[in-house]
Amino acid sequence: MKILLLILIAYLLGSIQTGLWIGKVFFHTNLREHGSGNTGTTNTFRVLGKTAGTITFLVDMLKGTLAVLLPIWLGVTEVSPLIIGFFAIIGHVFPFFTGFKGGKAVATSAGVLLGFVPLYFVFLLLVFALTLYLTSMISFSSITAAVVGLITLATFPAIHFLLDGYDPIFSAVLIIIALVIIFRHTENIARIRNHRENLVPFGLNLTKQNPNK
């Protein structure tokens, strides 16, 4: 019963679309009608500005971290905290409160890793940051971090010091998380291939994207 309750809490926690509610309450703006139409961090930055975007990222990430920590705090040992965290990701992607149309799972997935394997989170964050500087694309940086996450599973003996929380479930959950992130960026991948992906106002833009062409 406790496990089912934790799953429900994690899903409902993930279902809170931070950017959407910040836009409606403080800016009287529906994110679904502006920019890419997505309710996640990137579109919030683009439409509502840095402050709203930063708050959205932190809250969305915290949803994943809290979901992972809940079973630990409550002493529930019958299920891996990663499983509970995964349901927060499901909630973020398919939110009950907004017609099952949510974000791309990047920030919430990062929060899950932060709560379960902090060093590994830092490693993938550095991968994300470096890729963002080189390409100026949040989408490509997110996809790259997901792919690197998959690659590191094959090299686990070499990076075991980053995965102090590793167990067999970790591999399964990480694979699913990575695939969800990649799948949710299908439209971005198409724009990248056509050199029309949206950019952040810094970095090298090595792939020469031009969203205005």
UniProtKB/Swiss-Prot annotation:
Its EC number is 2.3.1.275. SMART domains: G3P_acyltransf. It catalyses: an acyl phosphate + sn-glycerol 3-phosphate = a 1-acyl-sn-glycero-3-phosphate + phosphate. The keyword Transferase applies. Pfam families: G3P_acyltransf (PF02660). It is a multi-pass membrane protein. One of its GO terms (biological process) is phospholipid biosynthetic process. The chain crosses the membrane at residues 3-23, 55-75, 80-100, 110-130, 142-162, 163-183. Pathway: Lipid metabolism; phospholipid metabolism. It is found in: Cell membrane. GO terms for molecular function: acyl-phosphate glycerol-3-phosphate acyltransferase activity. It is an enzyme of class 2 (transferase). GO terms for cellular component: plasma membrane. Its main location: membrane. It comes from the Bacteria. Keywords: Cell membrane, Lipid biosynthesis, Lipid metabolism, Membrane, Phospholipid biosynthesis, Phospholipid metabolism, Transferase, Transmembrane, Transmembrane helix. Probably interacts with PlsX. Belongs to the PlsY family. Catalyzes the transfer of an acyl group from acyl-phosphate (acyl-PO(4)) to glycerol-3-phosphate (G3P) to form lysophosphatidic acid (LPA). This enzyme utilizes acyl-phosphate as fatty acyl donor, but not acyl-CoA or acyl-ACP. NCBIfam families: glycerol-3-phosphate 1-O-acyltransferase PlsY. This is Glycerol-3-phosphate acyltransferase. It comes from Streptococcus thermophilus (strain ATCC BAA-250 / LMG 18311). The lineage of its organism: Bacteria, Bacillati, Bacillota, Bacilli, Lactobacillales.
